[in-house]
């Protein structure tokens, strides 16, 4: 028999470290290219992207090879969707649009085995060959809820009362829309709400996360956030731009 694979991102958060997670179009080969770059986890997109039950096993397996926590964002707060995603190999699940305490409690109920929750009793792909999987799984699974509506910000005190959620992630894009600013994540009004939510989460003793690129991550760390996802696509654009500039200079 073998030991249950450790959830690297969860361990690092529990150790007080910063966790950074690339997101964007992914396949197994691309995940492996991220492997040597030192990231804690990979964000597998099942709400706005093509990740589904057919490819979760192989995508999470690629993460396993490089000791990166596979984080799957599911498309809804649905018990069967959450526990089936864990069954197929996810070590962490991100659930969108958590706006109330009851919705947060539902995430825990779906994502944790008894006595914490009521996750369907089935051995995950992560549990293959693990003799005591059910007694260890709750310690190695990770739950992330998205605070991405203004109603969630207004209900944040009650949502933060829910235990067994690893990260309360403030998502600026949808938040901006619910504030009346579609596409306005960079507006000062939205940034103010995001920063206030991060302060409240971190001051409550819970872990705050958000979307942040190179320019903003230092500011959010100062506010107390410790979990960051970011798109790798700007790196691609910046690299392409630099290459084209170099070619143009060399041929002038």
What is each of the regions a protein language model found here?
Residues 23-37, 76-84, 150-162, 212-218:
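Short, acidic/polar
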Residues 1-23, 130-139, 195-203, 252:
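N-terminal amphipathic alpha-helix/helix-capping segment at the start of soluble metabolic enzymes
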Residues 19-23, 42-44, 70-74, 93-95, ...:
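Hydrophobic faces of well-ordered beta-strands that scaffold small-molecule active sites
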Residues 80, 86, 90-163, 167, ...:
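Conserved anion-binding
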Residues 1-70, 74-77, 143, 164-165:
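Conserved N-terminal beta1-alpha1 strand-loop-helix module at the mouth
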Residues 59, 63, 101-117, 233-252:
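C-terminal helical cap(s) of enzyme catalytic domains, especially alpha/beta-barrels
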Residues 218-235:
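Short, electropositive alpha-helical surface patch
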